[in-house]
Regions:
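Beta-strand-enriched cores of mature, soluble protein domains
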Residues: 1-149
Length: 149
C-alpha cells in the first residue's frame, strides 16, 4: 500500500462577521475579507461575500460547508470549496462561542479543500486535493492548507 503524504500549500486568514443563526442548528458565518500566503508565490486577499454554512448537530459537532473566493496578487481568481468538521467538548465549545482564546489542540477542526480557477498560472490547483486544519479566534479563522500527495 502506498502511503499518503502532505505538503504545505498555503495559510488563509479569514476575517469573519458575527454568526447569523437560522434556527434548528442551522447558521452561517459571513466572510469580511482576509489574506492568504503560501508556496510558489501564492498570496493575495480573501474576497468579501464568502460564507461558511454550518449545521450544529445534536452532539455539538459543527458540520462546515464554506464557499469563498481568493484574489491573487496577480489578480487571478480562485474559487474555494471547503467541507469538514469542528468538534470540541462542551466546555471548549462554550469558550469558542464567547470568543475566548482557545489552543487549537483543544478541539478538532479539519476540512477537505477543492480549488477551481481559470488562471493559467494556477491551473495546477484544479488537479489537486487538499486538507486543512483550522483555528477559530474571535473575529478571525486561520486555515492551514496542505496538498495531498
Amino acid at each position: 500500500m502506498r502511503p499518503v503524504g502532505l505538503r504545505e500549500l498555503l495559510s488563509i486568514r479569514v476575517d469573519v462577521a458575527p454568526i447569523v443563526d437560522l434556527g434548528g442548528g442551522r447558521r452561517y458565518v459571513p466572510f469580511d475579507g482576509g489574506t492568504f500566503e503560501g508556496r510558489d508565490g501564492l498570496a493575495g486577499t480573501i474576497l468579501r461575500g464568502g460564507v461558511d454554512w454550518q449545521q450544529v448537530r445534536a452532539d455539538g459537532v459543527i458540520e462546515i460547508d464554506a464557499h469563498y473566493a481568493l484574489a491573487s496578487t496577480e489578480r487571478e481568481a480562485v474559487e474555494v470549496r471547503s467541507r469538514g468538521l469542528r468538534a470540541a467538548s462542551p466546555e471548549v465549545a462554550a469558550r469558542l462561542s464567547r470568543g475566548d482564546a482557545v489552543d487549537p489542540d483543544e478541539y478538532y477542526f479539519r476540512t477537505h479543500v477543492r480549488f477551481t480557477t481559470s488562471a493559467p498560472r494556477l491551473d495546477w490547483l484544479n488537479s489537486i486535493l487538499a486538507v486543512s486544519t483550522g483555528r477559530r479566534d474571535r473575529d478571525v479563522v486561520t486555515i492551514d492548507v496542505h496538498e495531498v500527495l
